[in-house]
A protein has these predicted regions:
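Conserved Walker A/P-loop ATP-binding site and its immediately adjacent core
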Residues: 32-51
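Conserved lysine of the Walker
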Residues: 10
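Hydrophobic positions on the alpha1 helix immediately C-terminal to the Walker A/P-loop
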Residues: 13, 17
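Conserved helicase/translocase motor-coupling segment
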Residues: 129-135, 145, 149-169, 177-303
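Signature of the SF2 helicase/ATPase Hel1-core->accessory helical subdomain module
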Residues: 88-156
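C-terminal accessory regions
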Residues: 120, 269-368
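Conserved RecA-like ASCE ATPase "motif II neighborhood" in helicase/translocase motors
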Residues: 56-115, 273-277, 338
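Hydrophobic anchor at the beta1->P-loop junction of P-loop NTPases
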Residues: 2
């Protein structure tokens, strides 16, 4: 079990571990006796791993591809009547802990443990996004305790993504973890700005994106405006983030060029005109992240609060049925996790616009 906050380097560690398992002479004996697979329950992350798999010519050792989503992988094991060897799970917090229409098991991790010799799981409970990913009993704590007793619990403590001084990293973490906005002295290394309008924010991010020496810059937002994924791409966008007389389309609506279709959302050039969400940016680095904080995040009486009535993320704000049949709402925690993911994408800068006037004012006053 490998634990680490957003930006701790979990994905880099996992992809290099898989590559070592598949290609290193020193540990070739592991591959000789085991199938090697990399599992991630996130479409855009999967597309990146698929590209690595193709370029590096990865071979799992079985009839299955190396990189797969968990439900697809478990179904394939059943169909092929084989057991897994070493299974590396990236973004382990996105595994399901409840069945749905496509997945009839009760818990992805429990099923993976039952079907594999070794599972390496990367995990951050502050990045759980959906009620169906929450552990509603003590099973995960028991697994964590067991891993710790056996010396199999690793914690990544360094911040590898955000290239800022510790005060700036702490300022961002205080917003997320403590719901507090403290004063922040300007950081020469890391550019944090609060914009007066979404127009200005969009313009600034587009300008940053023109120079991609340090990476791609994109606009993202909390899921506070309606969006339904269309099975078939429409000729023109249908779902928008709208603030006053400004609007921009939600992610995955502008058709990519054919050559870019298999790339992740952030790597497709046309997405500079769209607004990303946790569904498209979780797990990724951006050079500059432009974050629109929607009306579900408010600032009242010196504290940030989360208003589930303003969120359009049904998977986060609807009740979850517990083992005893009781219904429980985890919405506020999940909206906090959503903000965590969005505010921790930028490597060199974070640009913000907040819809809530009191939040916007508090953020502007905080930056000295």
């Amino acid at each position: 079990l490998v634990k680490g906050e957003a930006g701790a380097g979990k994905t880099v560690l996992m992809s290099s571990l898989v590559d070592d398992l598949l290609n290193s002479e020193d540990i070739s004996f592991i591959k000789d006796n085991n199938y090697i697979n990399l599992i991630v329950n996130h479409n855009n992350q999967l597309s990146v791993y698929k590209e690595i798999e193709r370029k590096l010519n990865w071979n799992s050792g079985s009839s299955l591809e190396v990189a797969m989503k968990p439900t697809q992988f478990l179904n394939a094991l059943r169909k092929e009547k084989i057991k897994a060897g070493v299974v590396i799970v990236d973004e382990g917090h996105l595994l399901l802990t409840a069945k749905n229409q496509a997945y009839l098991g009760g818990n992805h991790l429990i099923d993976l443990l039952a079907q594999s010799k070794v599972v390496v799981l990367v995990y951050d409970d502050k990045q759980i996004m959906n009620k169906s990913q929450i552990w509603t009993d003590n099973t995960f704590f028991e697994l964590e305790h067991e891993a710790n007793l056996e010396g199999n619990l690793i914690e990544l403590r360094n911040q590898m993504r955000i290239k800022a001084n510790p005060e700036t990293v702490n300022w961002i973490r205080r917003i997320i973890d403590d719901c507090e906005i403290k004063k922040l002295t300007k950081d020469k290394q890391y550019d944090i700005r609060i914009f007066d309008s979404p127009f200005e924010l969009q313009k600034a991010i587009k300008l940053k994106n023109k120079d991609q020496k340090l990476g791609i810059s994109r606009l993202v937002a909390t899921y506070d405006w309606p969006y339904v994924e269309e099975k078939k791409k429409q000729d023109r966008p249908k779902w928008f983030v709208e603030i006053g007389d400004w609007k921009a389309p939600w992610n995955q609506q502008i058709k990519p060029e054919k050559k870019d279709a298999k790339l992740s959302w952030i790597e497709q050039p046309q997405t500079i005109d769209e607004i990303g969400s946790t569904f498209t940016v979780q797990g990724f680095d951006l050079n500059y992240a432009g974050v629109i904080i929607g009306p579900s995040v408010k600032y009242r009486n010196g504290k940030i609060m989360f208003d589930i009535s303003e969120s359009k993320n049904k998977g986060a704000v609807q009740n979850r049925k517990l083992e005893n049949g009781e219904m429980k709402n985890f919405g506020e925690d999940l909206l906090k996790n959503e903000l965590n993911v969005l505010l921790t994408r930028g490597v060199n800068g974070l640009y913000i616009y907040a819809v809530d006037e009191e939040l916007q004012e508090a953020l502007k006053e905080a930056i000295l």
